[in-house]
């Protein structure tokens, strides 16, 4: 090998690409160079209730010494959990067996990558565990691999976009059972048999966050369709919601056009629909953070008209919702020329794909505040780095400490009393499970659980909004 280093930070390595008699170079941080031309090929995966055994094969190289096998936490602040492993050496290869016992690991939500730590040229390198065929991807589609990982939690393996092995750790879900896989296979079979008929229906599926809400742009779009379109025009427009959700009461009058979330009909229509219309991304149309799923992979390929759930102006959403982001849209509704310019310039959509439509939920927004009820709405937005963390980690966050301190402030309670005002603390839906951790001081502060009262009704009657960088400010301003 030939090595060049630039100020000790970048390694330049020439190599022959696939034996095609050409020379290429790659510039990477030194600790990632070995991973460019060395593969830890996954040969086999064995599973039991709480353990996963991974068998890997790696070509031996002069000067390369394996030091460790770890699970690496995927986060801005990464840390490693050592994994038990064995190594056998043949003439040309290392045979590495990694033993992962998830019950014994102190895991955090969400993503963990399997890495081999090796030393070469005095530099510690990390080598990813890679799949070399689609066999395991297909295996994950058909099987129900998951591992117990402590009380109320589980982890499962998945195939990353780069073809590597990773694990997702989260709370248990009612959709983790093998019955979900059976439902997926049944729906797939029905779809294949009746695809021409189902496609002719031109089905539209409308939904909101987690398919558990009916109070955002998706709901008002659906309501408009039900009340203003002809029977022929609306006959194949459906709203997907969990009928156990409180908001179901608002739309049950349209029950012929309501589909129960995660029912066989839902899974079948997810495959059959020609368009999704939603205030949230495609991931909200299916079981949240589901295991490797053939249905979930099909959802990503269906057209979607994104109604948005907040004006795009305060947050950089390009990496997520941009045309080349992780969750791109087919059509992207905007509320003004100003917002359309942002979506076109920074998210890379054409004007035709980002029409100025306004928000359907704004059709019902009006000021219903009264002098007799001086209501203040306190609604901060969520924090991506705190999504689905444990209660213990959430309680340590600055977010919790600051808002908890405010809600228990005697000075705030005194101010509210002096002005005969009251305050509602409405936590973001993604933090709904953490509301139980907050306490308040006085009777003039109310902690409203997600779904108990429609947010737009609270906004309509509030005198003042206090927020950070939540797009809810645009609704109140409107």
What does each of the following model-derived ranges do?
Residues 214-229, 360-437:
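Conserved catalytic-core segment of nucleotide-activated headgroup transferases in glycan assembly
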Residues 1-203, 227:
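Basic, ligand-binding patches in group-transfer machinery
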Residues 288, 306, 450-478:
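A donor-sugar binding/catalytic signature common to diverse glycosyltransferases
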Residues 436-450:
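Nucleotide-activated donor-binding/catalytic signature segment of Leloir-type glycosyltransferases, i.e.
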Residues 195-204, 300-302, 369-374:
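A short, charged/proline- and glycine-enriched loop
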Residues 54-55, 73, 82-84, 93-97, ...:
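Active-site and donor-binding regions of nucleotide-sugar-utilizing enzymes
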Residues 241-247, 428-432, 470-471:
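Short, polar loop motifs at secondary-structure junctions
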């Amino acid at each position: 090998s030939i090595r060049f280093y630039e100020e000790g930070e970048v390694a330049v390595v020439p190599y022959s690409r696939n034996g095609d008699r050409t020379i290429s170079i790659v510039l990477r941080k030194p600790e990632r160079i070995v991973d460019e031309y060395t593969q830890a090929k996954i040969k086999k995966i064995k599973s039991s209730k709480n353990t996963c055994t991974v068998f890997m094969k790696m070509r031996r190289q002069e000067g390369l010494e394996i030091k460790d096998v770890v699970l690496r936490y995927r986060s801005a602040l990464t840390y490693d959990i050592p994994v038990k492993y064995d190594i056998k050496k043949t003439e040309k290869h290392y045979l590495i067996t990694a033993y992962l016992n998830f019950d014994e690991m102190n895991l955090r939500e969400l993503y963990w990558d399997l890495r081999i730590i090796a030393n070469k040229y005095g530099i510690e390198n990390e080598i990813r565990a890679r799949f070399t065929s689609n066999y395991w991807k297909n295996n994950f589609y058909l099987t129900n691999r998951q591992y117990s990982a402590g009380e109320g939690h589980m982890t499962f393996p998945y195939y990353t976009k780069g073809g590597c092995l990773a694990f997702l750790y989260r709370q248990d879900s009612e959709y983790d059972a093998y019955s979900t896989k059976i439902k997926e296979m049944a729906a797939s079979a029905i779809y294949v048999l009746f695809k021409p008929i189902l496609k002719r229906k031109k089905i539209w599926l409308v939904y909101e966050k987690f398919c558990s809400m009916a109070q955002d742009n998706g709901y008002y779009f659906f309501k408009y369709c039900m009340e203003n379109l002809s029977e022929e025009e609306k006959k194949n427009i459906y709203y997907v919601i969990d009928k156990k959700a409180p908001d179901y009461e608002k739309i049950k009058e349209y029950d012929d056009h309501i589909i129960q979330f995660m029912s066989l009909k839902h899974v079948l229509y997810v495959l059959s629909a020609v368009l999704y219309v939603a205030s949230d991304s495609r991931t909200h149309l299916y079981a949240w953070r589901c295991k490797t799923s053939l249905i979930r992979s099909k959802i990503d390929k269906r057209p979607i008209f994104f109604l948005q759930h907040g004006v795009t102006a305060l947050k950089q959403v390009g990496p997520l919702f941009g045309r080349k982001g992780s969750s791109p849209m087919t059509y992207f509704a905007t509320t003004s020329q100003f917002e359309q310019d942002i979506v076109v310039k920074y998210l890379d959509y054409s004007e035709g794909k980002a029409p100025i439509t306004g928000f359907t939920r704004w059709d019902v927004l009006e000021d219903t505040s009264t002098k007799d009820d001086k209501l203040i709405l306190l609604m901060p937005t969520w924090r991506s780095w705190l999504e689905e963390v444990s209660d213990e980690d959430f309680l340590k966050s600055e977010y919790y400490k600051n808002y908890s301190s405010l809600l228990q402030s005697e000075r705030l309670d005194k101010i509210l009393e002096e002005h005969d005002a009251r305050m509602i603390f409405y936590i973001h839906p993604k933090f709904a499970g953490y509301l139980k951790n907050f306490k308040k001081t006085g009777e003039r502060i109310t902690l409203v659980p997600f779904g108990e009262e429609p947010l737009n009704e609270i906004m309509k009657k509030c005198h003042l909004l206090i927020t950070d960088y939540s797009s809810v400010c645009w609704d109140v301003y409107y």
